[in-house]
Amino acid sequence: MNARGMTLLEVMVALAVFAIAGLAVMKTASEHLSALNYLEEKTLATWVVENQLVQQKLEAKWPGDSWVEGGEQMAGQTWYWRYRGVATADNNFKALDMEVRTAPKAESPVAFIRTYISR
């Protein structure tokens, strides 16, 4: 018997191959979008940290040892920042820790920077 078409089994195997390939493409696209969201959040949080560091420098105040908290609007979202001074071995220098979160009581910060300032 001379068949000119595909058998049902061949069609089912071809569909399975295309379905698996489609799932792999969808998974890759989903991971890519997730990474883009993470990078956007991290970038915006870093900008908030940098804004607050510039503000701290402009005010030229010696930071205290307790946390100072506040919020800032950027890109349609409220970012919650806090900073504190940390004593160093040299009294003329102080470490400045700054954190940014997406929620006031979020467990871990989106961005954290430690820098040093002088009197």
Swiss-Prot record:
<protein>
    <recommendedName>
        <fullName>Type II secretion system protein I</fullName>
    </recommendedName>
</protein>
<dbReference type="Pfam" id="PF02501">
    <property type="entry name" value="T2SSI"/>
</dbReference>
<keyword id="KW-0472">Membrane</keyword>
<dbReference type="InterPro" id="IPR003413">
    <property type="entry name" value="T2SS_GspI_C"/>
</dbReference>
<feature type="modified residue" description="N-methylmethionine">
    <location>
        <position position="6"/>
    </location>
</feature>
<keyword id="KW-0653">Protein transport</keyword>
<comment type="subunit">
    <text>Type II secretion is composed of four main components: the outer membrane complex, the inner membrane complex, the cytoplasmic secretion ATPase and the periplasm-spanning pseudopilus. Interacts with core component ExeG.</text>
</comment>
<keyword id="KW-1003">Cell membrane</keyword>
<dbReference type="GO" id="GO:0015627">
    <property type="term" value="C:type II protein secretion system complex"/>
</dbReference>
<keyword id="KW-0488">Methylation</keyword>
<keyword id="KW-0997">Cell inner membrane</keyword>
<dbReference type="GO" id="GO:0005886">
    <property type="term" value="C:plasma membrane"/>
</dbReference>
<keyword id="KW-0812">Transmembrane</keyword>
<feature type="propeptide" description="Leader sequence">
    <location>
        <begin position="1"/>
        <end position="5"/>
    </location>
</feature>
<dbReference type="InterPro" id="IPR045584">
    <property type="entry name" value="Pilin-like"/>
</dbReference>
<keyword id="KW-1133">Transmembrane helix</keyword>
<keyword id="KW-0813">Transport</keyword>
<dbReference type="InterPro" id="IPR010052">
    <property type="entry name" value="T2SS_protein-GspI"/>
</dbReference>
<dbReference type="GO" id="GO:0015628">
    <property type="term" value="P:protein secretion by the type II secretion system"/>
</dbReference>
<comment type="function">
    <text>Component of the type II secretion system required for the energy-dependent secretion of extracellular factors such as proteases and toxins from the periplasm. Part of the pseudopilus tip complex that is critical for the recognition and binding of secretion substrates.</text>
</comment>
<dbReference type="Pfam" id="PF07963">
    <property type="entry name" value="N_methyl"/>
</dbReference>
<comment type="similarity">
    <text>Belongs to the GSP I family.</text>
</comment>
<feature type="transmembrane region" description="Helical">
    <location>
        <begin position="6"/>
        <end position="26"/>
    </location>
</feature>
<dbReference type="InterPro" id="IPR012902">
    <property type="entry name" value="N_methyl_site"/>
</dbReference>
